[in-house]
Amino acid sequence: MRLRTSLGVASACASVASAALKVTEDNSTITLANDRLTSTFAKDKGRVSELFLDGQDLLGPISGNTGVGPYLDCYCIPSGFYTAGSTDPRLEVVQGTDSTGTKYAGVILNDTYTPTGQQFQQYWFLRDGETGLHTFSRLAYYNETTPFLRNLQEFRTLFRPNTELWTHLTSSEAQTAPLPSKEAIANEVVVQDATWRFNNTPNDAYYTQFSEYFTKYTFSNCMGLFKTYWYAASANLQ
């Protein structure tokens, strides 16, 4: 009863099955699909806007910056955060056969942050017979006059579902916890930057099973592998 999604600068998650790879495109979207996984990309945003596995909606409805992904985000422009595709997203479809003889189809996002000339690329690939997307990210900056803009921080691929399907977060076989409930989040206490305390909801599953505190760094012990694993509440997703 587990769906394993691998996200990051270079990542993959796959389970081999018989499939027929298809690519469709219209004025607003590009869709990659095989017999099990369907991924739709919004051309005006440069990101995945729909993701279905065996008919199950993995993202839920779009609401702000949730219900979308995977997409590329970073803390790398002079003002701070930037989402690739926010300036001038250009999507390109690629298709071919890899060295194993397996067919693949992909979407490549190209975007340039105009004020600095920083160039962003995000790649998504779907192989015939697999149940996950392969992703790869690139950032380039060429400027001899101003060779240093700021530190490159949080260059990351984000997956932000907006559905009750997802119940747990884990970064390794040894570290797993239930997601904090909506009540716990509503009553959280800010401790410091990106760190919260759930002492107001001591009966919450996250509090009782894992920790009184939550920080965005809690599940970063596997960053060397650039992997994050999510557990799903629905059956028959494996």
Curated annotation (Swiss-Prot):
Similarity field: Belongs to the polysaccharide lyase 4 family.
Keywords: Carbohydrate metabolism, Cell wall biogenesis/degradation, Glycoprotein, Lyase, Polysaccharide degradation, Secreted, Signal
Protein EC: 4.2.2.23
Catalytic activities: Endotype eliminative cleavage of L-alpha-rhamnopyranosyl-(1->4)-alpha-D-galactopyranosyluronic acid bonds of rhamnogalacturonan I domains in ramified hairy regions of pectin leaving L-rhamnopyranose at the reducing end and 4-deoxy-4,5-unsaturated D-galactopyranosyluronic acid at the non-reducing end
Protein encoded by which gene: rglB
GO molecular function annotations of the record: carbohydrate binding; rhamnogalacturonan endolyase activity
Enzyme class: lyase
Signal peptide residue numbers: 1-19
Function: Pectinolytic enzymes consist of four classes of enzymes: pectin lyase, polygalacturonase, pectin methylesterase and rhamnogalacturonase. Degrades the rhamnogalacturonan I (RG-I) backbone of pectin.
Subcellular location: Secreted
Stored SUPFAM superfamilies: Galactose mutarotase-like (SSF74650)
GO annotation terms (biological process): cell wall organization; polysaccharide catabolic process
Name of this chain's protein: Probable rhamnogalacturonate lyase B
Major location category of this protein: secreted
Carbohydrate-modified residues: N27, N110, N143
Superkingdom classification of source: Eukaryota
An annotated GO cellular component: extracellular region
